[in-house]
Amino acid sequence: ISNVKGNETFSQNGTDMSWNTSGQDIYYQGKTDKELPVKQTISYYLDGEKMDPDEIAGKSGKVTIRFDYKNNQKTTTTVDGKKYSVYVPFTIMTGMILDDSFTNVKVKNGKVISDGDKNMVVGVAMPGLKDSLKVTSSDFSEDIDIPEYVEVTADVKDFSMDMTMSVMLSGITTLSYTHLRAHETVLDLVCR
């Protein structure tokens, strides 16, 4: 691990690290040989045919971009004296800005906001939560579900993308529900 934006140092005792921050933020990077807590897989389809990113570049047609997430962090918790194996509750938000070469943009498990020139797409997924709760989509009404993927479809001319971004929070409790109205969902709160 190395400090990338300062001279602050840390001391280490086993896996515990203590930084001498003097009240300042620390920016660091490092490498690990451990599996990431969540694996993200991005798949691209053109007119229903799966393609590699370099194959789809420059092509036109009905494009689908699917973000699948696999939660790799299981833990054991005890509730009322019984032990349960549950996934760490991660909430993942994936977003992108699509230019005007993308039309008829739709997203599963997300929202599309257009300013006339660009479409901002934000999707939310909570991989592993259904398994931890031992529920399936059929346990919910059609208006409620626990999303585990994000899928964007659009008609595209000369496909290219600048970037996508994903943010992962360890638990949905980091979101504030204070202003969530009865008719809204967590996605509405995130996309405000």
Residues of each region from the PLM?
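Hydrophobic alpha-helical segments, chiefly the membrane-spanning helices
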Residues: 190-191
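N-terminal, leucine/charged-rich tether regions that mediate assembly and partner docking
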Residues: 1-174
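Conserved small/polar residues in nucleotide/adenosyl-binding loops
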Residues: 178-185
